[in-house]
Amino acid sequence: MPILHIQLGGQGKTPDGKIVPLPPAIALQQRGPVVQVSVSLQESYAKALVQQGNPLPQPMTGFALLDTGASNTCIDDEVAQQLQLPVIDVGSMCSASHAKTPSNIYPIQFSVIGFPIQLQCPRTMGAALKEQGLMLLIGRDMLVYCTLFYNGGTGQITLCI
């Protein structure tokens, strides 16, 4: 079982504008449990593209939030467009801030940097995540395969897949 153990870090500004390092516990509180990921087209769709003689879009890397509040994994819509992901369906997204909103559904695969595993996520919802500095929200549909330990006091997370 692969294990990833990280301690978050970051920087903040003092009232006079000086940049200072943040204690790990504060960095984890402010940013949440984030990991670096590589995202690409789901394997079955990628194989079909190759069989047709089409080039595969290059994977993209960025940050993902391990989000126990999200029922589904979500990808930033702009990232989905840059990866030229096909829209395979339209679903309804609900959140604490808005009622049902139409959302494109994309087939992706992703890996958490540091893990030797490609995770297939065939029904990933599109969302506006760029403003939060995120590429993905890893929701409960994928976290069901994981053990996550969140140690707020030390600013550390441990993820087992």
PLM regions: where:
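Pepsin/retropepsin-fold aspartyl endopeptidases
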Residues: 1-161
